[in-house]
């Protein structure tokens, strides 16, 4: 049960972080992401072939994907832990949860005058699905290895 609570708390903290960022104004958000974009530029675009505003926008989109990837990992951990506790496999609940977070995230941005786009929901959801998929794959691989070791003894 400790794992269930730990993953639930991590997922809730990630949701608060995501929605907290969405509550920021355009200026606050740009001030926060500009230094990150500048520090990543020498690594991702060393010859500076991409225009600065385009690169900044790319980094902002990438940040959303990374945030939602992490959310997907935490939600998958919660679902796997809770499923083991309940002796059930939970698949649709985590998918609907991360989709709901993405939709609400864009809805919040509508009120902060940052604009809300369906493409951003799709991008966020894709990041979350990637996180869910990677985490589920790792959890099932871990269980498979664990079961093989138990049967080998």
Functional labels for PLM-detected ranges:
Residues 68-82, 128-142:
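Membrane-interfacial alpha-helical segments at the cytosolic side of multi-pass membrane proteins
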Residues 56, 60, 69, 97, ...:
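Active-site alpha-helix of zinc metalloproteases
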Residues 15-23, 98-107:
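Aromatic-anchored segments of alpha-helical transmembrane domains
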Residues 83-96:
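Internal alpha-helical transmembrane segments of multi-pass membrane proteins
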Residues 102-126:
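Interfacial helix-loop-helix junctions of multi-pass membrane proteins
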Residues 1-69:
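"…centered on the first transmembrane helix and the immediately adjacent amphipathic helix/loop
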Residues 147-153:
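Short, charged juxtamembrane terminal tails flanking transmembrane helices
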């Amino acid at each position: 049960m400790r794992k269930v609570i730990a993953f639930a708390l991590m997922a809730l903290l990630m949701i608060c972080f995501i929605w907290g960022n969405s509550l920021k104004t355009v200026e606050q958000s740009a001030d926060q992401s500009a230094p990150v974009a500048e520090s990543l530029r020498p690594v991702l675009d060393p010859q500076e072939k991409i225009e600065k505003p385009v690169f900044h926008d790319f980094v902002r989109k990438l940040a959303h994907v990374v945030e939602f990837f992490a959310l997907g990992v935490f939600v998958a951990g919660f679902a796997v832990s809770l499923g083991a506790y309940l002796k059930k496999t939970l698949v649709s609940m985590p998918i609907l949860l991360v989709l709901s977070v993405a939709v609400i995230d864009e809805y919040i941005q509508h009120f902060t005058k940052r604009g809300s786009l369906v493409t951003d929901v799709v991008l966020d959801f894709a990041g979350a699905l990637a996180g869910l998929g990677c985490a589920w794959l790792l959890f099932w691989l871990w269980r498979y290895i664990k079961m093989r070791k138990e049967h080998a003894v």
